[in-house]
């Protein structure tokens, strides 16, 4: 999830659109509560924070926005297997939806050598995500989404948790 909304606040204060509504879904009650408290300190920023579960994805909106940008950043990683309808639900955010998912899934698509092996072992050892690439592939096949580009293994963290972008 979005945690306490750090990425949303950084985008807004880093020059993000002032007219946009910044919406964050977070699994933990404490994360949602902290994000809501921080949002009160940012009165010029339009925000909404809600409970979101990657295992049972549901968006709380009554109707879709005209345009939506949906992104995840090392959020899905902590859910061993996301629901196969994850993308089906997320595209309901808007009439036109652009997505960007910086998640550690590169090893699921291609073995690039020792780093991929270490990363896969790390993910399995921690019971972290092992099906993002498959759910993405199925959503592409069903034409729920269309892929423009995938960038594998873009950065390395000290614990070999390498992010890829879809």
Residue ranges and their predicted role:
Residues 114-141:
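Conserved Class I S-adenosyl-L-methionine
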Residues 96-107:
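Conserved beta-strand signature within the Rossmann-like core of class I S-adenosyl-L-methionine
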Residues 70-71:
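A conserved beta-strand element that flanks and buttresses the S-adenosyl-L-methionine
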Residues 152-166:
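Core SAM-dependent methyltransferase catalytic element
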Residues 56-64:
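Short conserved loop adjoining the S-adenosyl-L-methionine
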Residues 6-56:
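Class I SAM-dependent methyltransferase SAM/SAH-binding core
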Residues 3:
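Conserved glycine-rich SAM-binding loop
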Residues 78-90:
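A short, conserved alpha-helix within the catalytic core of class I
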């Amino acid at each position: 999830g979005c945690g306490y909304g750090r990425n949303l606040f950084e985008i807004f204060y880093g020059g993000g659109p002032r007219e946009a509504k910044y919406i964050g879904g977070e699994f933990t009650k404490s994360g949602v509560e902290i994000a809501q408290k921080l949002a009160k300190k940012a009165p010029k920023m339009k925000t909404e924070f809600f409970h979101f579960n990657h295992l049972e994805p549901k968006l709380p909106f009554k109707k879709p926005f005209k345009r939506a940008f949906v992104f995840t950043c090392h959020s899905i990683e902590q859910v061993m297997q996301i629901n196969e309808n994850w993308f089906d639900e997320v595209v309901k955010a808007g009439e036109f939806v652009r997505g960007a998912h910086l998640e550690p899934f590169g090893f699921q698509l291609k073995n690039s050598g020792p780093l991929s092996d270490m990363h896969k072992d790390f993910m399995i050892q921690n019971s972290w995500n092992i099906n993002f690439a498959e759910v993405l592939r199925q959503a592409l096949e069903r034409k729920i989404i269309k892929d423009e580009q995938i960038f594998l293994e873009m950065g390395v963290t000290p614990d070999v948790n390498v992010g890829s972008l879809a």
